[in-house]
Structures are given as C-alpha cells and as structure tokens.
Amino acid sequence: GFDTEKHAPELAHYNTEGIVCPKCESILQYRLNTYANLGDYVCLNCDFHRPELDYKLTELTKITNTTSEFVIDGQDYKINVGGLYNIYNALAAVSVAEFFGVAPEQIKAGFDKSRAVFGRQETFKIGDKSCTLVLIKNPVGASQALDMIKLADYPFSLSVLLNANYADGIDTSWIWDANFESILEMDIPEINAGGVRHSEIARRLRVTGYPEEKITQAEKLEDIMALIEKQDCDHAYILATYTAMLEFRDILAQRHAVGKEMN
C-alpha cells in the first residue's frame, strides 16, 4: 500500500463509496486517502484499521500525464503510463515480484519495456493531431482519468464518448458521480460529446459550468474523428466507454492509425 505523508484521521470525500466499517458499521476515516476509498483507513469506534504493510510505496517522485516515478521498498521505479491507478497496478506487480524473489533490476527492466495497451492511454495520429485514447467505465475511473489528463502541460481538445450497451452498463447515471468539474481547471478550448448517449454526456459537461457554445455533439464516431482533425489544438484526449472505445478503434484501424490487434 501507499505509506506517504499522513495526517490526523479525517473523513473521505462525501461522495465516496465503501467507507463503512465492516465490524461496527461506523464511518471509516483516513490518515492517508489516495483516491476513492483507498488509503490508510481506520475506524475510530473499534479496532478495525488497515493491516500493516508488507510492501510500501513511500514516495511519489514525479507524476506526469504520460509517466510516473515512485519509490517502493527503497527502490526507485518508473512506468511509462500516467495515472495514480497505474501506480497501484505497479505496486501490486512489485509486491508479487518481491514475494517470488525477483530482483529489483529485473522488475525495472520489465517496467521499462511495458507500454500502454489498446484503449488504455493508447496513442495515435488523427491527421496531424497527437491523440490519446483512455477507457472510462465508472465514476472512480473517469475521475482518475480526468486527474491524469489535467497534468498535461499543453492545451488539448477533449472528446467524451458515452455508449450504453451491456458491456458499458446500460445505466449511465454514474457520469454524475464522476468529477467532470475538474475540466474547468484544464486548458481545453473545445469539447466533443459523442456516442449513443452523446446528449447525456453533453448535459453533464454543461452542468460543470463549461461554456455550452464550446461543446459539440455528434453521435457518429466518424464525425467525432472529423471534429478532432479540424480543431486547433495539436493534442487530443478521447475518453470513451468500452464499446465506444472498440468502435472508435475499429475506425482508426480502418484508417491504419492503429493496429487491429488488441494487445
């Protein structure tokens, strides 16, 4: 787990799920809350708390929208993807590797070779635009994706593609629990709302206070691609639910912008 800077116990964000003590049903508090309900939790009403850590991340050295550097058990590591959630994935990988006696140098070599896979910070070109595709499928994941792209030090256009097929989840009300308000903290001149539920995601974006005249709706993903190609920004982020991501990749593959394989 994370064992970075701590503070006196305090409540998690009011919109956080899964923070009820499983022993006494009191509300958990956190000495360290990384995101959602993760971190160093403690119940002030009974003895329930996070177990002692066998493997510790003690420092977040540098985090950008494309890379992350951190210290686990005294070793410096770097991964070639952004996002706090990917640091958790790396921590899990290091923990398993250490348990089986894999040397830190081998772990670092593995991280150095790893790259983003399909739909998970996958990069490609649409015309002359440098684009990144990011899968979103729930409030926590969407909020973390938004936190990640917020670290970009350049302006970018944003496209949010919302479908409601069974693989996406037919109930799209989760978008109201995701922190789309964070777009107001970013340098985003234009936003495209696409997919089967384009009007719903456009409404969610309007509610944040983002200017309505800067939001363009298009159900067809080919039209979203055309919008990205003609917009002024050199960079574009595309946040897409699962089937929207697959459909978007199919169009990209037909244009030979990405490979058809999903690896």
Annotate each PLM feature.
Residues 1-6, 161-162:
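Conserved phosphate-donor/acceptor-positioning beta-strand/loop module used by diverse small-molecule
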Residues 4, 86, 198:
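Short, flexible micro-motifs
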Residues 8-11:
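Active-site neighborhoods of enzyme catalytic cores
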Residues 13-18, 22-28, 33-50, 95-102, ...:
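ATP-dependent carboxylate-amine ligase
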Residues 47-125:
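Long, charge-rich boundary regions
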